[in-house]
Amino acid sequence: MSRFLSNATNRIDAKGRVSVPSAFRSVLAQRNVQELYCFQDFVFPAISIGGPDLLERFERQIAAEDPFSPDANEMSLLIHGGGVFMKLDAEGRLMVTDFIRGFTGISDEVTFVGRADHFQLWQPQAFVAAQAQARGERKLAGKRS
């Protein structure tokens, strides 16, 4: 099965592009993803990225709600108002736009984080801190990490 796993940090080039890790590009190719759906994560200061199926999953959740309900409107605000479509260039690079930089605080490096069915873009130190916090919370709760 193709899953986005692990993490890797890559430097942004002078033109504002970053190479997507080859393992992540392989998953995108296996899934035949041509266009990336990118949205501002609901919990973390990260950009979540997947194929159009990720957007479709959220839209099915909205469609199951009363279209005038606060839940449906809030979800639409997040996934439509906080989302964009992007493409990788021929060399497997992603343009690190103001949309990405402004939400994440990314400047010269990007940490790619696998999240099974999608991946995320993080400012490297923010990822390290969030991972340490998650590990600490699990340890306090007596759960194995």
From Swiss-Prot:
Keywords: Cytoplasm, DNA-binding, Repeat, Transcription, Transcription regulation. It is found in: Cytoplasm, Nucleoid. One of its GO terms (biological process) is negative regulation of DNA-templated transcription initiation. Residues 7-54, 83-126 form the SpoVT-AbrB domain. It comes from the Bacteria. GO terms for cellular component: cytoplasm; nucleoid. GO terms for molecular function: DNA-binding transcription factor activity; transcription cis-regulatory region binding. Pfam families: MraZ. PANTHER family: TRANSCRIPTIONAL REGULATOR MRAZ. Forms oligomers. HAMAP family: MraZ. Belongs to the MraZ family. This is Transcriptional regulator MraZ. It comes from Rhizobium johnstonii (strain DSM 114642 / LMG 32736 / 3841).
